[in-house]
Amino acid sequence: MLMIKDNVYRDYRDNILVDKDNPVLAFKANRDRYFRNGNQDVYAGLSHLGSINSEDAFTWNVIRSLSLSNNYSPVEDLIKIELTNPKALLWTLAFDDISKELQYIVGSTIRNIDGKHKGQITEPDIIIESDTHLI
């Protein structure tokens, strides 16, 4: 596990606890990288997921762990809502077959909203759909 300045792993997968080789994670790692800007030149080309402070790595580790265990009770306890038959997306992408259809529905909805107003394109970090709720 090689790190640069004790802050960013050369291989982002060293910062990931579960399902390290998932294609969604690889896509995110390839898309969101450090670039030369003067302050962080030493990290140029490395994935943001490799940062020890990466909220996206934290998000992946938590939500993917819950999904793999099929146990969203920590989320249910936090938001006081029962999540029956939960399906999850991270960064609007399905990381398993259960959530594939949800990815297309959410993507279509976002395309109808984004681009019609100034500002950054929407990319929710976490979307969870159950039989009765969309979070």
Question: How should these model regions be labeled?
Answer:
Residues 1-135:
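Charged, terminal alpha-helix-loop-beta segments
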